[in-house]
């Protein structure tokens, strides 16, 4: 009697079924990713084919079949020796063997402790081989004979590259892992790209098949989709359709940069097929803020890519966003981390993970090959992030043949020059259209600080007026720090105004409620007091703004929340910038940049902020930008060194560095301890997210006494006061890193 062997147990799936499904995924990728041969040669698909067939053979071990969770060995170690029976040269067999060996864990993880790769001490290995051989009849009479039919399924012909020898059991026992690892050490640089693609696409096929998906999705005709929605294409939208390379796009807010980006993507996508054309490249739409990503995901899904899975979302809290918006969050979030979706809206950090060796980075790098990267709001990043993006782009364009589109309404020329050095792009600016038709603001510099100004405001019809400003309801009051925003909110509230406060120190649940309230009931409020979160988070339109001083590019982002569609009817609204900020602003912005901004704006005080003048104004502000430029270039150089040292199949030592650089922390106010404890007890972990407040590593380390880690719940709690109205109150905390 032959015992059938399972590859998956919940639900049960036979080994040959899992392999068959993974091969179907491979077939889908092979028919789409036509460029793979440009990187790794013509026989790559054959190598991947046999890698998939053999990758889980070790699961036939009796102990694994009996109880995989309690089995004390690695099935991939037992799968690896079967490459001996492939009729390829040793180099190709070693590529397959290493990809199989590391498809779950990296080399140093397998080569330590109880999971030791059998180099010298082979007793444990030989014992597990005997377990495998107890099910050899399944392999020889049921599984391996299917290989010929799989060859015909994928390649339409017999390859006959796999042939068991008569003494195959002994050859398995005598497989030389030491020799394999020595070959790896000698060839890991020379064969780097082969190892990345072979392991990466094995993981892609394996993971998708395990998730119940048997093909990858490809994009529809984006030009057709966009043109169905737009009556006429604008000048730049026409031009990007003939831009078959990297590009930098500069256009004012309201121009339609999203549609322009989709048209650029259409122009640069590969075409596969004749009767039915598919567009196989992966497109990454990259934005700096999670709120912007959420809004873009909804827009693309509802307007252009409504089919299931065509567009997805990926950031540190996307799972919770999908959950609260009643999407099939587990499935969508799982697939978003795989190679399934053709268009991903995400933060740059999700792509950077690959270059820091985080997670299944070979799979991510495989789908980044020949990808199209759209960077919107590129001006919004700190110099260190900009430097890393530049380093990442240099490698993606040079080594992975990716293309990039950089977009911004407010990009300093020095920043544009840095990207031009990497991209060698086509520059796209309005030439025929008059940019001033997008003008919608009159600029007013006013004396004093925000506290004194709001104390003097008097209500007059639909306005709030003082000696130096006339604010039309609803008013956005933009503050540079959370503390100042709370102070302003309290004063306005005490004066009897209908006011709402929003900043980043609310729990995610409260922040979600506040954003929905602004979207649905903005006109019922006199004032909305906010920090920088309002610059990017909401697609709403205020009638006026009173803002603390900030760098010009940040101010323009804030103005973008005012009179958003006014340009269509020639409506102009006043924006008011105070000349004085607060003492704590130095932790947020460079004093010299803010000072220079005020000097530049003084020249056009009381005038229209014409779109045709914006670039010159920004360049004046940043005319002495050498320090910022040097910082960016320094980080770029360091990033390139780090990225080029990334070794495939090996766990990167830079993973911790990545999380320290970019990943903040979330804490739970102690007032929610009992609630969170109960949710954990009920297994409702996604609900716990409602009670998390984001903080920085800086504050955790510097003010550690206010935080405690619950080992059982694996959650950091804070003793700082929390109010649903005001957010997390810093008490004794320094303002420095509580800025948003």
Where are these regions (language model features)?
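Accessory nucleic-acid engagement/destabilization modules that flank
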Residues: 2-220
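Post-DEXD/H (motif II) to motif III coupling segment of the RecA-like Helicase ATP-binding lobe
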Residues: 363-372, 377-434
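Conserved RecA-like helicase motor core of SF1/SF2 enzymes
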Residues: 70-73, 505-508, 525-572, 577-582
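Conserved Walker A/P-loop ATP-binding site and its immediately adjacent core
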Residues: 279-304, 315-318, 411-415
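C-terminal accessory region of SF2 helicases/translocases
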Residues: 2, 559, 565-740
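Walker A/P-loop
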Residues: 244-265
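Conserved strand-helix element at the start of the C-terminal RecA-like helicase core
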Residues: 282-296, 467-493
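Interdomain hinge/linker at the junction between the two RecA-like core domains of SF2 helicases
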Residues: 413-468
């Amino acid at each position: 009697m032959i015992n059938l062997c399972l590859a998956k147990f919940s639900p049960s799936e036979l080994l040959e079924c899992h392999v068959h499904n993974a091969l179907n995924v491979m077939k889908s990728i092979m028919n789409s990713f036509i460029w793979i041969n440009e990187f790794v040669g013509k026989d790559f698909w054959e190598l991947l084919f046999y890698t998939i067939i053999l990758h889980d053979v070790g699961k036939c071990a009796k102990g694994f079949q009996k109880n995989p969770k309690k089995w004390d060995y690695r099935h991939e170690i037992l799968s690896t020796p079967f490459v001996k029976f492939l009729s390829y040269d040793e180099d190709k067999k070693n590529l397959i063997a290493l990809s199989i060996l590391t498809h779950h864990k990296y080399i140093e993880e397998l080569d330590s402790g109880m999971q030791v790769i059998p180099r010298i001490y082979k007793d444990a290995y030989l014992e597990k081989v005997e377990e495998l051989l107890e099910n050899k009849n399944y392999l020889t009479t049921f599984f391996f004979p299917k290989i010929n039919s799989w060859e015909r399924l994928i390649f339409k012909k017999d390859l006959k590259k796999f042939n068991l020898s008569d003494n195959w059991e002994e050859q398995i026992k005598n497989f030389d892992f030491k020799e394999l690892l020595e070959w790896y050490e000698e060839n890991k640089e020379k064969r780097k790209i082969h190892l990345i693609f072979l392991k990466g696409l094995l993981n892609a096929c394996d993971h998708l098949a395990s998730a119940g998906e048997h093909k990858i999705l490809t994009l529809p005709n984006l030009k057709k989709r966009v043109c169905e929605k737009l009556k006429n294409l604008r000048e730049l939208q026409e031009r990007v359709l003939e831009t078959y390379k990297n590009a930098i796009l500069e256009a004012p807010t309201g121009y339609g940069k999203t549609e322009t980006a989709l048209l650029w993507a259409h122009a640069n996508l590969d075409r596969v097929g004749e009767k039915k054309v598919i567009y196989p490249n992966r497109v990454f739409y990259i934005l700096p803020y999670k709120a912007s990503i959420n809004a873009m995901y909804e827009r693309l899904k509802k307007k252009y890519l409504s089919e299931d899975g065509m567009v997805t979302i990926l950031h540190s809290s996307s799972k919770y966003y999908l959950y609260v918006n009643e999407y099939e969050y587990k499935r969508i979030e799982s697939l978003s981390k795989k190679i399934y979706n053709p268009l991903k809206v995400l933060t740059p950090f999700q792509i950077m993970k690959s270059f820091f060796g985080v997670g299944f980075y070979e799979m991510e790098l495989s789908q980044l090959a020949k990808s199209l990267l759209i960077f919107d709001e590129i001006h919004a990043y700190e110099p260190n992030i900009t430097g890393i993006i530049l380093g990442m782009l240099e490698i993606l364009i040079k080594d992975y043949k990716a293309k990039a589109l950089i977009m911004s309404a407010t990009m300093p020329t020095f920043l544009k020059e840095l990207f031009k050095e990497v991209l060698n792009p086509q520059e796209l600016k309005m030439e025929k259209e008059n940019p001033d038709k997008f003008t919608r603001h009159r600029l007013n510099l006013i004396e004093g600080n925000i506290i004194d100004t709001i104390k003097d405001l008097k209500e007059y019809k639909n306005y709030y007026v003082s000696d130096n400003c006339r604010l039309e309801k609803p008013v956005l009051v933009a503050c540079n720090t959370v503390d100042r925003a709370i102070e302003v909110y309290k004063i306005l509230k005490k004066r009897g105004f209908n006011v709402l406060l929003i900043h980043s120190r609310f729990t995610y649940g409260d922040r979600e409620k506040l954003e929905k309230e602004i979207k649905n009931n903005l006109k019922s409020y006199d004032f909305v007091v906010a920090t920088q979160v309002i610059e990017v988070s909401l697609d709403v339109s205020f009638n006026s703004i009173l803002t603390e001083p900030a760098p010009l590019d940040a101010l323009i982002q804030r103005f973008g929340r005012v009179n958003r569609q006014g340009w269509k009817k020639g409506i102009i609204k006043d924006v008011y910038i105070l000349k004085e900020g607060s003492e704590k602003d130095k932790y947020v912005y460079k004093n010299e940049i803010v000072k220079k901004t005020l000097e530049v704006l003084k020249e056009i005080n009381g005038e229209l902020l014409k779109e045709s003048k914006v670039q010159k104004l920004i360049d004046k502000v940043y005319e002495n930008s050498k320090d910022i430029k040097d910082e960016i270039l320094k980080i770029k150089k360091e990033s390139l060194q780090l990225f080029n040292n990334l070794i495939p199949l090996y766990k990167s030592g830079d993973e911790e560095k990545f999380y320290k650089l970019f990943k903040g922390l979330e804490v739970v106010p102690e007032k929610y301890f009992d609630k969170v404890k109960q949710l954990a007890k009920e297994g409702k972990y996604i609900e716990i997210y409602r009670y998390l407040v984001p903080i920085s590593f800086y504050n955790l380390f510097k003010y550690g006494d206010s935080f405690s880690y619950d080992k059982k719940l694996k959650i950091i709690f804070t003793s700082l006061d929390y109010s649903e109205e005001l957010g997390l109150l810093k008490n004794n905390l320094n303002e420095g890193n509580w800025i948003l």
